[in-house]
Amino acid sequence: MTRRCSHCNHNGHNSRTCPNRGVKLFGVRLTEGSIRKSASMGNLSHYTGSGSGGHGTGSNTPGSPGDVPDHVAGDGYASEDFVAGSSSSRERKKGTPWTEEEHRMFLLGLQKLGKGDWRGISRNYVTTRTPTQVASHAQKYFIRQSNVSRRKRRSSLFDMVPDEVGDIPMDLQEPEEDNIPVETEMQGADSIHQTLAPSSLHAPSILEIEECESMDSTNSTTGEPTATAAAASSSSRLEETTQLQSQLQPQPQLPGSFPILYPTYFSPYYPFPFPIWPAGYVPEPPKKEETHEILRPTAVHSKAPINVDELLGMSKLSLAESNKHGESDQSLSLKLGGGSSSRQSAFHPNPSSDSSDIKSVIHAL
């Protein structure tokens, strides 16, 4: 029995040894030469192009990118974000770089509105960028500013510092002034002229008087041409106007001086010093300070030195020997002034005691 291929319906081989077999994935045989694209809704044109290319001469692989036109190959998937009409199907869309004007307006909005209000900066200042792009640009700007101390490899747009307020054009600083009516502008100009030249109201009267005088003088004089009189009057008028303008111009202040400030309130009284002492009072002269001497004590003998031999009774002291009866003939005493003292001394025995009794007692023992 001859083998029959289930793939090409030819005899002599089976589907496993078929030379025209394709790739089988999940039970489905894929016969397309290119499997990079699928037959999805976003790739129908490529699917049709590859199908039509398969019926060609066969010189190239059917469905290869070389057989597909540029506009067909550029369709691809809807989620791949390919550039439409590009020759390269894998070319990705690139963002447009920020210009200096956009970055300057971004810095101005960042200075006015602060960090975080990216929607306000995008709406009022950088109108060509979305809030997401403004936030991304701000993140790059802050990272660049935090790495200022490091070595910079190349200059960047983020190195620009915010300009001063004086360098910003007036239409950007005050955008609401464009809607001001013409009448208010005229009134503002009139008020400015009035404040700058308050004394200019009196100038026409002076000029008119001098002009009348010059006209009278020209009318009174005869024989002078009118052109000469008109030239003289115009020159005098020009000199007077220049003098008035020089008087009305404010004097320039020195760079280190302060403007003169006049007090807004004047007190009804003025303080001045008033002496309390009467007019004829003469103050006493100051007393001189007295000088004090330091007194130091000195040892002085007020009496003559005492002689020990002259002391009362000191030379009459004697120690007498006792007699044979055991009684002392002379007692150790101090005789003052030759008188006897009635006071009993500790060195004298009691005279009232009887010696016989003592002896008897001793003998009795």
UniProtKB/Swiss-Prot annotation:
Domain HTH myb-type: 90-146
Induction: Slightly induced by CdCl(2). Accumulates in the dark. Diurnal expression pattern with maximal levels in the morning (at protein level). Specifically induced during leaf expansion. Expressed in old and dark-treated leaves.
Name recorded for this polypeptide: Transcription factor KUA1
SMART domains in UniProt: SANT
A single GO cellular-component term on record: nucleus
Note: 'Kuoda' means 'enlarge' or 'expand' in Chinese.
Gene Ontology MF terms: DNA-binding transcription factor activity; transcription cis-regulatory region binding; zinc ion binding
Domain-related comment: Contains a R/KLFGV repression motif, which may be involved in the activity of transcriptional repression.
Listed Gene3D superfamilies: Homeodomain-like
Motif segment (R/KLFGV (transcriptional repression)): 24-28
Annotated DNA-binding residue span(s): 118-142
Description of the deletion phenotype: Defects in root growth. No visible hypocotyl phenotypes. Increased sensitivity to the gibberellic acid (GA) biosynthesis inhibitor paclobutrazol (PAC) and auxin (IAA) that inhibit hypocotyl elongation. Reduced leaf size due to impaired cell expansion associated with an enhanced expression of peroxidase (Prxs) genes. This phenotype is reversed by SHAM treatment, a peroxidase inhibitor. Increased accumulation of H(2)O(2). Delayed senescence. Enhanced auxin-responsive gene expression.
Alphabetical list of InterPro entries matching this protein: Homeodomain-like_sf, Myb_dom, Myb_dom_plants, Plant_Stress_Dev_TF, SANT/Myb, SANT_dom, Znf_CCHC
Known tissue expression: Expressed ubiquitously, except in hypocotyls, root tips and lateral root primordia.
SUPFAM superfamilies the UniProt entry points to: Homeodomain-like
Localisation per UniProt entry: Nucleus
Keyword tRNA processing among UniProt keywords: no
Zinc finger (CCHC-type): 3-20
PANTHER family registered for this protein in UniProt: TRANSCRIPTION FACTOR KUA1
Superkingdom as given in the UniProt entry: Eukaryota
Comp. bias intervals (Low complexity): 220-254
Function statement: Transcriptional repressor. Direct regulator of the transcription of peroxidase (Prxs) and reactive oxygen species (ROS)-related genes via the recognition of 5'-ATCACA-3' motif. Binds to 5'-TATCCA-3' motif (TA box) and represses the activity of corresponding promoters (e.g. sugar response genes). Regulates hypocotyl elongation in response to darkness by enhancing auxin accumulation in a phytochrome-interacting factor (PIF) proteins-dependent manner. Promotes lateral roots formation. Promotes cell expansion during leaves development via the modulation of cell wall-located Prxs.
GO terms classed as biological process: intracellular auxin homeostasis; lateral root development; leaf development; leaf senescence; negative regulation of DNA-templated transcription; negative regulation of transcription by RNA polymerase II; positive regulation of cell growth; post-embryonic plant organ morphogenesis
UniProt keyword Zinc-finger present: yes
